[in-house]
């Protein structure tokens, strides 16, 4: 009887438990997002964000092919490591669809897709076996600018390319040219990080900047024709001329002075709106511009010029967390990836910081291949407290392997002649013997002697003398800033002292022993 009761109780308990409603089992659904990161050695890096996943896999198929299902992506795809998928062995200049899926122990995520187009390597890039070098770099300012003259023609460019000596013989001058500019006057926007009231340049401004230099009939065409015409007169040079192209800054904020302004103002790449609060998107904008320039260069196909590399426009690179406005600049998170991309194609990354600017001692970490220091001594007028030091300049060059920028100006330096009539002409940084503009308040300065011409010529001579004295002549590279038009103004000046100064500078450039190394 007792055994019978135990049996009945057990059956009752079983039925009671079995009839209770079960709690639903919670299944964590895997979710993933992917975005383009970079191209590298014939492949592509894809950035992954995921939740509730054990692993994420990705693969690429030619655009238009059937999309793979989740099982196939896992079987044939590449597994993400450190939130990054690398898919290699891709053809250049080809459109691909990248597919990715996340897995968990119980299910798959939704398959996600990203369209990419691999960069092309042009014939002149394939044939390049090493990085291009040069002894001297001549700055050619321009772009969509409010400065005058706005456009370059063969007459203006000529004195940058060749010079005629005292005996009437013509000689080749600079080896390389930097195409540089900092504004899009048509859009009233700045290509460079600044704290003024200008709007940050967007993708359209970047295009206009590149087109000014590289489009049909642009400065590249004029420079190429100038070299060809000179070669017909004096024979081909012993070197091939180089060009370095300036890259606009990918400025985080639409209005840099307003730290609440938009970070998504710039434009789209691969159909996606870039957000410059993400350094990866700033890198992507740089790469877009590099590819735009390369494509334009290929179309232009200059006969006498090679594209040597790209230049960082900002003259200060805040790359340490304790630097001023670091959270809005973060160059240490941007430039190394840009440098890596350039190096794949044997392009160099260049920079010219102003005196003691942040970043001058971090160029190796930032991936910068060559740097020229600005001494800024040309503007250390006697009436100003002297703050610039040749000792610092050359100690820095010795420590980091930098070169030096030579600095002088022509009529561009005449702004501020309002004090000329009162006998205080200190505002002129023009090297010219005669005033070329009516920038004084009375509009009467033009044609008058420039009382600071001798001082400014001596400042230019100081650059050359100090460079030699420090042992850098024949050892370190030279860059030259000459304002917007000083080379032409000196070379064509009716004043003998101006022409003498021009030839003195030219001899310093062409007699540099580094040219023979």
List the model feature ranges, each with a label.
Residues 122-288:
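N-terminal catalytic cores of secreted or lumenal carbohydrate-active enzymes
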Residues 41, 92-93:
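Surface-exposed loops/turns
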Residues 97-101:
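Extracellular recognition modules
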Residues 2-5, 15-37, 119-120:
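Bacterial Sec-dependent N-terminal signal peptides
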Residues 58-91:
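Recognizes extended acidic, P/S/T-rich segments that occur
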């Amino acid at each position: 009887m007792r055994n019978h009761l135990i049996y009945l109780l057990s059956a009752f308990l079983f039925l009671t438990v079995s009839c209770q409603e079960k709690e639903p089992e919670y299944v964590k659904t895997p979710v993933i997002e992917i975005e383009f990161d970079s191209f590298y050695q014939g492949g592509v890096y894809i950035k992954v964000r995921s939740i509730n996943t054990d692993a994420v896999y990705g693969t690429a198929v030619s655009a238009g092919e059937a999309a793979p299902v989740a099982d196939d992506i896992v079987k044939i795809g590449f597994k993400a490591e450190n939130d990054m998928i690398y898919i290699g062995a891709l053809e250049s200049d080809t459109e691909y669809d990248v597919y990715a899926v996340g897995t968990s122990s119980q299910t798959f995520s939704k398959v996600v897709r990203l369209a990419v187009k691999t960069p092309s390597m042009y014939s002149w890039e394939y044939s390049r076996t090493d990085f291009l070098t040069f002894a001297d770099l001549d700055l050619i300012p321009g772009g969509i600018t409010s400065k005058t003259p706005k456009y370059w023609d063969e007459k203006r460019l000529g004195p940058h390319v060749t010079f005629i000596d005292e005996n009437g013989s013509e000689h080749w001058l600079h080896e390389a040219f930097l195409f540089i500019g900092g504004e899009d006057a048509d859009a009233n926007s700045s290509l460079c990080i600044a704290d003024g009231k200008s709007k940050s340049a967007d993708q359209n401004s970047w295009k206009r900047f590149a087109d000014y230099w590289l489009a049909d009939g642009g400065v590249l065409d004029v420079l190429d024709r100038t070299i060809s015409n000179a070669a017909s007169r004096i024979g081909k040079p012993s070197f091939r001329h180089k060009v370095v192209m300036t890259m606009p800054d990918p400025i985080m904020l639409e209005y840099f002075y307003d730290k609440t302004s938009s970070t998504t103002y710039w434009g789209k790449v691969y159909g996606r709106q870039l957000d410059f609060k993400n350094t990866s998107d700033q890198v992507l904008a740089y790469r877009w511009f590099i590819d735009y320039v390369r494509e334009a260069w290929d179309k232009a196909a200059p006969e006498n010029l090679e594209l040597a590399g790209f230049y960082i426009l900002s003259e200060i690179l805040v790359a340490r967390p304790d630097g001023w406005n670091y959270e809005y600049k973060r160059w240490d998170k941007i430039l190394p990836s840009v440098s890596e991309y350039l190096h794949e194609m044997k392009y160099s990354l260049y920079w010219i910081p102003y005196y003691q600017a942040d970043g001058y001692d971090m160029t190796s970490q930032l991936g910068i291949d060559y740097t020229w220091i600005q001494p800024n001594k040309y503007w250390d007028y006697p009436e100003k407290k002297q703050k610039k030091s040749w000792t610092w300049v050359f100690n820095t060059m010795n420590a980091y392997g930098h070169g030096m920028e030579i600095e002088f100006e022509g009529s561009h330096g005449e702004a501020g002649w309002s004090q000329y009539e009162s006998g205080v002409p200190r505002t002129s940084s023009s090297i010219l013997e005669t005033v070329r503009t009516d920038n004084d308040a009375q509009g009467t300065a033009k044609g008058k002697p420039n009382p600071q011409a001798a001082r400014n010529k001596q400042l230019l001579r100081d650059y050359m003398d100090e460079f030699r004295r420090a042992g850098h002549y024949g050892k370190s590279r030279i860059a030259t800033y000459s304002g917007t038009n000083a080379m032409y103004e000196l070379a064509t000046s009716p004043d003998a002292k101006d022409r003498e100064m021009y030839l003195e500078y030219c001899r310093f450039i062409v007699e540099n022993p580094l040219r023979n190394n």
